[in-house]
Amino acid sequence: MQLEIKVALNFIISYLYNKLPRRRADLFGEELERLLKKKYEGHWYPEKPLKGSGFRCVHIGEMVDPVVELAAKRSGLAVEDVRANVPEELSVWIDPFEVSYQIGEKGAVKVLYLDDSEGCGAPELDKEIKSSFNPDAQVFVPIGSQDSSLSNSPSPSFGQSPSPTFIPRSAQPITFTTASFAATKFGSTKMKKGGGAASGGGVASSGAGGQQPPQQPRMARSPTNSLLKHKSLSLSMHSLNFITANPAPQSQLSPNAKEFVYNGGGSPSLFFDAADGQGSGTPGPFGGSGAGTCNSSSFDMAQVFGGGANSLFLEKTPFVEGLSYNLNTMQYPSQQFQPVVLAN
């Protein structure tokens, strides 16, 4: 009796899944099983299977079986919801060794379960059972022969576990081979667009061995930073009023300022007005020869940056560090500076 009730309940509950709350549908099945077992006590005749068949029939339609109404009430479902989600005029006969159903008053009677001990008519019933399978009922699997045991059946046992009883069949774990997993998106070995060439080159270079990756090009020094340095240098020179007539010897030249070349070239002095005199044609103390002299109004750059006893600044290497520009060709920002005239 327990097996036949399970088959009938799984068929009915399969229509409620995905339409009503799953937990409520499970509770409805548990309550209906309990009530049917109690109802069939004393009305189950294995020796005469057809005896009391009308009494054991479960009908859901315009007239709903009182057992179904009570099970819906106890599980928190409305009878109208149960009736609206099952086929119209559904009748299920639960008899010893056989479970069948009918949809509609004039519908054909189809077999859900038949325990044929002698084995006659089993192949024909298999086709009938498959054709009567509910496609929306992924949980329900009809039982076609006696060889199907309870352990293999997806029908749960009510009352044995507090968890939901109508559990869908568990999906088989998906296994991958190395080749099949590599073909998936997660295991794809293809390079992304834009980085394939670089990545391929890196792999090739690592495979060849001994080849160093190409160095990144150095960033060019910003001319703005250099102009700012020149600006600070010129302003600091304009503010000086320390002038000496004796040029400093070659040995007192700062090693960091050897690249700094001052070319007078007969042009007006950078730091003095034309009234103070023109610079001589000979190179200044920063020239390549290092032996030239200046007039009385010349500006002794080596004395300032050299580090002698009369030097105003002992060490000012940050002003001239890294400079390799000619003062005559030096380009200043667009802002115009007024020349400063130093009085004798």
Swiss-Prot record:
Which GO terms fall under biological process for this protein? female gamete generation; negative regulation of cell population proliferation; negative regulation of osteoclast differentiation; osteoclast differentiation; positive regulation of ossification; regulation of gene expression
Q: Where in the cell is it found?
A: Cytoplasm
Record keywords: Cytoplasm, Phosphoprotein
- For bias type Low complexity, the affected ranges are 145-164, 211-225
Q: Give the Phosphoserine positions (modified residues).
A: S254
Quaternary context: Associates with CAF1.
Q: Outline what the protein does.
A: Anti-proliferative protein inhibits cell cycle progression from the G0/G1 to S phases.
Q: What is this protein called?
A: Protein Tob2
